[in-house]
Amino acid sequence: MISSKVAPGEEEEQQEAPAEVAPAEEELRETEGQLEAVPPDEASPSWATGPPLERLPPVGQEAPPPRRCHTDCLEAPLSSCFLRLGALVGANPWLFLLGPVLLTASLGTGLIFLPKEKENLEEQYTPIGSPAKAERRFVQSHFSTNDSYRFSASRTSSETNFASILVVSHRDSLLEPEAFAEVSRLDRAVQALKVVQENGTQILYPEVCAKYSVGCVPPNPLLFSWQQNSSLNLSELTFPIHSVADHLIHLAGFFGGNVLGYATTGNRQRLVESRAMRLLYYLKTEDPEDRERSQAWLTHFLDHFNDMKSDLALEDIEVVYFTSLSRQLEFEATSKTVIPLFHLAYILIILFAVVSCSRLDCIRNKMWVAVFGVFSVAMSVVSGFGLMLHIGVPFVIIVANSPFLILGVGVDDMFIMISAWQKTSLTESVSERLSNSYSKVAVSITITTITNVLAFYTGITSSFRSVQYFCIYTGTTLLFCYFYSITCFGAIMALDGKREVVWSRWLEKPDQKYSSFKKFCCVPFGSFPDEHGDDNHPMNLFFRDYFGPFLTTSKAKFIVVLIYIFYIISSIYGCFQVQEGLDLRNLASDDSYITPYFNVEEDYFSDYGPRVMVIVTETVNYWDKDVRQKLDKCMTQFEQNEYVDKNLTEFWLEAYMQYMNNTGNNPNDKNTFMNNIAGFLNFFPVFTYDINVSSSNEITSSRGFIQTIDVSSSSNKKRMLLKLRGIAENCEVPLMVYNQAFIYFDQYAAIIENTVRNVMIASTAMFIVSLLLIPHPVCSLWVTFAIASVIVGVTGFMAFWNVNLDSISMINLVICIGFSFDFSAHISYAFVSSNEPSVNKKSIEALYLLGYPVLQSAISTIIGVCVLAAAKAYIFRTFFKIMFLVMFFGAAHGLIFIPVFLTFF
């Protein structure tokens, strides 16, 4: 990502060219690209683009003894290999250009395997092997359901087909006959929807609705009662349970925005006002044929709901809607919104590359080389993605972020190689120039590739499949970027080098006819390009002559320290404010119809959470009084929990004890206890699917239900889940808690653990790499400091930018480690390697050598992902936000904090 460029005149480091490349004596050569003789003692200045190389001893002299901190154990062999590779590419440019092109064309055929089927959200965005998935398997294997006869939403183990409508009154309350009349019209219109299939058959709501007894499950129990008896007094309702003709109606979860009055019987309160109502249309799901017909009805519902709402001309109420299909459909539609941004991203990167690589003279100008360099990066994306699809790695929507990142990161190697080329002498052959350029950039582009690829591949250890697949795709594509940079792009540079030779010879011709044109177009400053490669970029001079001296003044250091203190305090505070977990509404685009639905649900229906099963997982002696007392004790602990409403507990055993007492039977006798269960279920059929009796007349498992409250935030969901599981685990009776929502709630408990583990693994990998390639203790310390500081900063400022800690942001935190390493390792190494006498001058020299490459790397990456800021989906905007924070804080550490802090030690 960053070039560690050494300016001319700072250290007269020279490296003897190999015998096969550089001649041993001065002679005029006719080699292609050779302009004039180059005496061996007038070699061009060395431009190191990695950590400075050890000076090689003159031929025939004994090498000096090694220094204590010998740093070229890997660097020297790597540079030697690249030197030979550069000579080979320079001698055969067309081979190394066409080879990657053909490889890209071959691997690109894998794009035909881009998935056409639906992406499983649960599989991709919930933790692998989460406890809730094991709990679900237990429920499915021990408890049956029947959505064609006795459906109960709280007893289902997985999400069923449904359509949900939230009705919000324009008045203070909808508990008025006029409002109920409008809602009733809406309800009848929904139930009247019918699907006409291609074969002419119709799918009617009564055919696909989930049933209890012989009728469809009412979408709202109070509305159903009012429809049966319009004289029902809506001003005398009790909450959360209301009695209608000796029948209990649960209003909790069906009415929101409530104003409660005085207490009535028991623990009920008078329902004075209610602003919102929920209508839930449950459909059959268990039978595959029924499921298909239900989904066809839901699709028809989605296609025609807005037209139906317009036809009804509802005046007193506003409605929003959502179905069990909505999240999946909207998630798939989200990916289409980002496709146009690819074109904009490539245009911006090409413009940036052209501006960065343009020169005023036509010989050194690398405008078209930069353009082809961007296409080389695009080839790596096609190759990497094609290879992954060929071997069957699933492509998930989050991977669509990857090309934007690769585009920004991939061009960094291009800038480094062009910079090294510009430092070579025009008097050398193309092969020699490319060979020298390769040897200079070997360590720089290799170390940045290794660190970034390692950072991504550590993400494979994540518990989220979406993170695994993103990291596999991106890490592999970065390897292709590296491979194409040293082959395809090197060949492009070699071909452009031949162009330089042709133009140079043309400029040298004493042709008076074109002299004015030459001066105006090709040599605007009236002098020929420097043949020895002295190419001081204005930005390098800015860091050396202005920024560096200013930053090392006492006042500037004091201000920098204050800024850092403010930065780290703010970041630590923000770390404690970060929300955990992926809000499922964020999987859809901003203009999706599900967004207002979730907003209304959060505003009016957040008081009551999921209804949780409390499952006795093993055979216990329910007729034993001690066992019942232990079980009652555990149920009391559940009810006393801050996230549980004790008034809405439902447990068959409690009802059975009352039944046994009313019938005068002894509940402490096994035979009496077991023989009366059948009669009990006849009176209370609702408990039929809560007791699992084996053929040997043993209760192998049973369940009750508790109602959760106040779990609207992700932190409360996490605490509720952990506390309920803790109570179940500590109970003397084997218990388990489960609700289908726990499948997604588990991410809240897993995300921090996964993030910490991935960050630790990646940081350890970076530390090992730093010791191997730049083994200086001071460098390792500053690399560790920078990584920790940037991670804390990015995590903290995520909270200020309304970004959750989820599987998407976890990816970026892993990326953060690679960039922090790049920005800090080179700066600190340049500082400790400097021969300047004072720490201030060492810092200035480090900025002179690396300030512009750090800035260029940050800008190119930000440009690559900045178009995602215009995306209409959270998952893409989040990627931009965090990458911007990573680049901004990483560059700030490399350009400001570390150069200042190094002067204090």
Swiss-Prot record:
What GO CC terms are in its UniProt record?
A: endoplasmic reticulum; endoplasmic reticulum membrane; membrane; plasma membrane; sperm midpiece
Query: Which residues does UniProt assign to the signal peptide?
Result: none
SUPFAM superfamilies according to UniProt:
Multidrug efflux transporter AcrB transmembrane domain (SSF82866)
Q: Does the keyword Oxidoreductase apply?
A: no
Q: Which residues of this chain are annotated as glycosylation sites?
A: N146, N199, N229, N233, N647, N661, N692
> In terms of one coarse class, where is the protein primarily found?
membrane
Lipid biosynthesis found in the keyword field = no
Q: Which Gene3D superfamilies match?
A: Multidrug efflux transporter AcrB transmembrane domain
**Free-text tissue specificity from the UniProt record:** Expressed in germ cells of the testis (at protein level).
**Where does this one sit in the cell?**
Cell projection, Cilium, Flagellum membrane; Endoplasmic reticulum membrane
The topology of this chain with respect to the membrane is: Multi-pass membrane protein
Read off the InterPro entries from this record: Patched_domain-protein, PTHD_SSD, SSD
Keyword annotations? Cell membrane, Cell projection, Cilium, Endoplasmic reticulum, Flagellum, Glycoprotein, Membrane, Transmembrane, Transmembrane helix
**Which cysteine pairs make disulfide bonds?**
none
Described by its record, this protein's role is as follows: May play a role in sperm development or sperm function. However, does not appear to have an essential role in spermatogenesis or male fertility.
- Please state which protein family the record places this protein in: Belongs to the patched family.
Q: What is this protein called?
A: Patched domain-containing protein 3
Q: Which organism is it from?
A: Rattus norvegicus
Q: What's the name of its gene?
A: Ptchd3
